[in-house]
C-alpha cells in the first residue's frame, strides 16, 4: 500500500492513529525510539496518544543499539512497536534485526524510518522484514523540495487519513519551545494544538510527485557525489567518518566541534550539527548519563 502525505510526519501520525484504532496498539503498548532521533518525532507520538521509550545508539552503526533493543523487548511484553531510524541516511541493512524482533513477538510493528535516505519509489514492502518504510522530500532531506513524504505499508494493515487542521503559528511556537528545551537542557512540555501538517500543497497525485522526484534525483545524486569527492580529497582522513554515513551529508568527527562550526560560519559557509540525545528533553531519568548519542553529537559535523 502506498502512503502519500504533505509531510512524512503526517504519515507517521496517521499510521499510529490507525494502529490504535484497529487494536494493534493498546493503552499500555510502547514504541521504542533511538535517543538521537529528531525531537519532533516523539511529539508525534504524544499527539497520537502512543507511549514510547528511548534506547541509546550503537557507535558502530549510529542506529539504535540492537542488543539493548532485543533485551528490552524480551523483558517487556508491552513493547509493540520499533521505530528504526537510518541515521544520517545510512544504507545499513537491519533485516536480521527485524527478523529477531519478529521471532520474539510477531505482532511488534516495525517502522523503517528512511527519511534521510535517497527516495526509493520501487521499494517492495511485502518482501521487507519491516511493516512500514517512510521516505521524505521535506526540508533538509536527501531531495529537498520543502514538501512531501511517502511510504509503503504492508497490505495486512489498514491506514486511515486523519482530518487535521493546520496552523503555522502553532508549528512555529512548538519549534520555538523545542529549540529552547534543547538549548538549555530543560524538559519539553507538550501542549497539543494544530502544529502538524502544512499549508502548502504541491501535488495531489502521487504519480506526478514521484515522476518529478525521479526526474531530479540523478542531478541531486551527482551533485552530492561531486561534493563528497572534494571533501574526501581535501580533508584529513582521520576526521572523515565511514563512507556509509555520507549519503545524506558528508560527516566528519572532530574534538573541537563548536570552534570548528564558528570558523565555518565566520567564513560565510554552512554546516550543521545533528540531533542531540533528547532523553532529558522528554524527561528520561538517565539524563546525566554520558550516552553514545551524546558522544556522537559532541563531535559530528554535517558538511553540505
Please provide the spans of the model-predicted regions:
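Conserved glycine-rich beta-strand-loop-beta hairpin in the small C-terminal domain of fold type I
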Residues: 199-229, 238-253
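Conserved N-terminal alpha-helix of the aminotransferase class I/II PLP-enzyme fold
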Residues: 1-24, 36, 220-228
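Short, conserved charged micro-motifs
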Residues: 25, 158-159, 255-264
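Active-site phosphate-binding strand-loop segment of PLP-dependent enzymes
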Residues: 61-147, 151-158
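Active-site C-terminal subdomain of aminotransferase-like
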Residues: 156-208
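Conserved PLP-anchoring active-site segment centered on the Schiff-base-forming lysine
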Residues: 16-74
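Conserved PLP cofactor-binding pocket of PLP-dependent enzymes
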Residues: 257-300
Amino acid at each position: 500500500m502506498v502512503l502519500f502525505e504533505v509531510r512524512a510526519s503526517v504519515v507517521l501520525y496517521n499510521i499510529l492513529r490507525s494502529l490504535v484504532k484497529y487494536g494493534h496498539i493498546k493503552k499500555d503498548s510502547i514504541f521504542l525510539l533511538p535517543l538521537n532521533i529528531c525531537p519532533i518525532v516523539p511529539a508525534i507520538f504524544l499527539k497520537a496518544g502512543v507511549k514510547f521509550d528511548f534506547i541509546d545508539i550503537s557507535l558502530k552503526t549510529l542506529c539504535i543499539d540492537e542488543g539493548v533493543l532485543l533485551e528490552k523487548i524480551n523483558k517487556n511484553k508491552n513493547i509493540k512497536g520499533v521505530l528504526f531510524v537510518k541515521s544520517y541516511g545510512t544504507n545499513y541493512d537491519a533485516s536480521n534485526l527485524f527478523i529477531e524482533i519478529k521471532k520474539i513477538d510477531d505482532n511488534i510493528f516495525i517502522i523503517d524510518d528512511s527519511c534521510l535516505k535517497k527516495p526509493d519509489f520501487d521499494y517492495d514492502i511485502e518482501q521487507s522484514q519491516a511493516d512500514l518504510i517512510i521516505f521524505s522530500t521535506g526540508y533538509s532531506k536527501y531531495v529537498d523540495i520543502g514538501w512531501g513524504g511517502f511510504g509503503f505499508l504492508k497490505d495486512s494493515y489498514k491506514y486511515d487519513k486523519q482530518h487535521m487542521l493546520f496552523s503555522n503559528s502553532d508549528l512555529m511556537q512548538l519549534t520555538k519551545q523545542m529549540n529552547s528545551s534543547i538549548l538549555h537542557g530543560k524538559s519539553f512540555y507538550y501542549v497539543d494544538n494544530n502544529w502538524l501538517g502544512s499549508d502548502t500543497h504541491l501535488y495531489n497525485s502521487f504519480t506526478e510527485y514521484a515522476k518529478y522526484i525521479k526526474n531530479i534525483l540523478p542531478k541531486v545524486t551527482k551533485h552530492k557525489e561531486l561534493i563528497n569527492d572534494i571533501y574526501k580529497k581535501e580533508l584529513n582522513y582521520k576526521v572523515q567518518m565511514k563512507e556509509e554515513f555520507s549519503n545524506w551529508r558528508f560527516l566528519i568527527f572532530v574534538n573541537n566541534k563548536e570552534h570548528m562550526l564558528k570558523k565555518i560560519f565566520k567564513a560565510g559557509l554552512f554546516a550543521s550539527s545533528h540531533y542531540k540525545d533528547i532523553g532529558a528533553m522528554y524527561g528520561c531519568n538517565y539524563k546525566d548519563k554520558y550516552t553514545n548519542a551524546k558522544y556522537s553529537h559532541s563531535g559530528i559535523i554535517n558538511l553540505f
